[in-house]
Amino acid sequence: MNDLNAALEQRMVDLGKRRSRQQIAKATERGSWAETPAGVILMKKALAPAIKMFEEWRAEALVAKNANYRQRAAVILKDIDPAMAMYVAVRQALSSASNRDSFKYSALSIGNSLAMEILADKFEEKAGALYRTVMRNARARGLGADRQAMAMRKANQWAGVIKEPWDGPTRLIVGTTLLGFVVEATGVIQIVKRRDGKKESQRLELLPKVMEWSERYHEAFGLTRPVYLPLAVPPKDWTTVDDGGFHDVLSFRQRVVTRAFEGQLDALRARPPTQVYDALNKLQNTPWQINARVLAVMDHVWKENLPFPGLPEREDQPIPTPPPEVDAAEKGSDIRKQWRRKVRAIHDHNAEQRSLRFEFVRALNIAQDYSAMDAFYFAYRMDFRGRIYSTGTTLNPQGPDHVRGLLQFSEGVPLGLHGLKWLGIHGANLFGNDKVSFEDRYEWACQNTRNAHLSATDPFASRWWTEADKPWQFLAWCIEWSQAMSMTDPTAFVSHLAISLDGSCNGIQHFSAMLRDEVGGAAVNLVPGPKPQDIYGRVAELTMKKLCTLAAKDSPDAWVYDGWYRFGIDRKMVKRQVMVLPYGGTFRSCLDYTRDAYRERVAAGAEDPFGAPVTGDELKPVPMLAKLIWESIGDTVIAARAAMSWLQQVTRVATKYGQKLTWVTPSGLTVFQDYRETKTRQVKTRFLGALVYSRLDEPTDKLAKSRQVTSVAPNFVHSLDASALVATVNRSAGHGVTAWMMIHDSYGTHAGRTEILARDLRACFVQMYEQHDVLKEFLEGVKATLPVEAHAELPELPARGNLDITDVYESQYFFA
């Protein structure tokens, strides 16, 4: 088995190396070596000094009295954007040097590329409709950058729109001039003389030491990009930041914290978070297997391209041809804006679906490879806040619905009486019937036993399961529920499914607990109730009440409020706005999500109270509604707003004195938050892509004050939900739980042991907030980094409410 695991780890490395080599080879073959990892590094290093050199030269050359080819080039380039010009030059020069092209060819390539950029700008300005038609067609045909430019050039010649910029000699002068700057600025390109028979030519080459470096770098780059797969044996226990996870070839490349801030790993070495390591190791020891029946259905659906939900689209949506009124409209007109928005949405959708297709096919292939294994395992790591993540690529227990539907625990556990109840509740939750009591959910499952049986026995003929919110996990449930209910004693059924218990807007649960907020706590099920509280429904209901009041007033805006009231604000209209609040949500995000929800609902067929969908720029109704939703959120989750504001105030003081943030979580993890300013610019071209590069002449070692302030609340609350998860895993392990599916605020185990997990997660949450005043501890940590005279600038701790945190013990819908 160890030999098998060693082979698997080597395969992960080999797959990563092969993928990296293929990408580098493709870029080099198409003359785009500058797009390789080594090329990008050289570009970013060279671009800023090359731009500066160009700007200084042009300023001097334009006032010089002696006439030469370089002064002529300065006149030609006097209106060119320096960043764009040097981006084109550096990119082309590096690619030419890697290919050992002649100096003349390289210079002409630069001149031609720059000329095409100028031609495209002027072509669109003079004949926008034709330009867009040509480019849209070229992209739809999948043409590369060079052929797109050729198509644009031919269309211009055919239509006679504008005269092409620069003749051949001029392009050579421009390219030669810019190439000289590149050679000087990069320090990595040499011009060498080569003899071919009697003919001698000058060629561009990368310096030998640069070629050697790039080869070593690309080899190392491939090693650092493994394709993570499940392991054949339990992963190595984490004992230090550098030791754990993988056993063999990957072991020396892994650290327990991904993307740690400078100094954090040293802090963890000095103060090991043993509780966190214990939880990581328990999760790593959870054995998994592929759900063969779900895999068979999914594989057939994909191969036959059947119209089943929950999977990515197999084909791109076609890009529509603009109607005549769009082509005839003036540039910048509303009709043009609306059309561009529509087309952009399709492009974005297609790009997203292509990515999802790639991830899905990879997950499906991995599942097929592992389908014969009785048990496999996932290595786990954490981010700088302590949030725990599986390292599996595409196939892992924290994946989307179709991935989680493919996975089940290798170990089976008899349901028992409690387990049968939890299995039934789980089915109702997956279907979307999760706003009612547990009793009603279980009753729903019992009433739909026949539907579940039909879906399980013939999922292609009986498609009831496809109506579920999470269809692929629900199909797995149908199979087990059908089997259990077919037995004389369903409680004896041995279940392999992971039963999930989800927090109710978990970030707000934590903020309400730390400040003992009885209003917010009641809204997110920190107190007992006969059925689950719906914070999204509460916010929607409060917003509707405000709309009703404002619509009845004699004011110029009453018609807007009346329109929204008639439109109806339901939980879906406010859900995203509420969800993101504890994770750094602002009024700006509230406005954006409100606009999105409105557009989606109108697109789905709802009658628009304002006559036309929101176009984005001039509309008054959406900001007015967003303001009311934002107020209603604040009225519902008072403590969350107060705690977030307080955290930001403390952070402002710390950043004023140049101090990063450090705090220790209840699980014993030392967290660093130390965002630094990065001064960047982005160069965009029409045919050669874009590059974000550093301005090397500007400081990059300053604290990013704004980011420090806006990030502290989400990072702080994430560190707390991670602590609760760690405590829950460790406690439940002591009570007999042996397998977990944990996703931040969603806890899962076998149905037969869900009662234990439900009890322990409540105990851990209550004890965490009984034993820790997390805001006070955070404040003391900040004080320790500041001079004494700065302490007076720190705000007082926010006031606490009267919530009895022990009510969580009796709240059955706290995690449900």
Please name every model-derived segment.
Residues 715-723, 728-732, 738-754:
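C-terminal, well-structured subdomains that either form a transmembrane helix-short loop-helix hairpin
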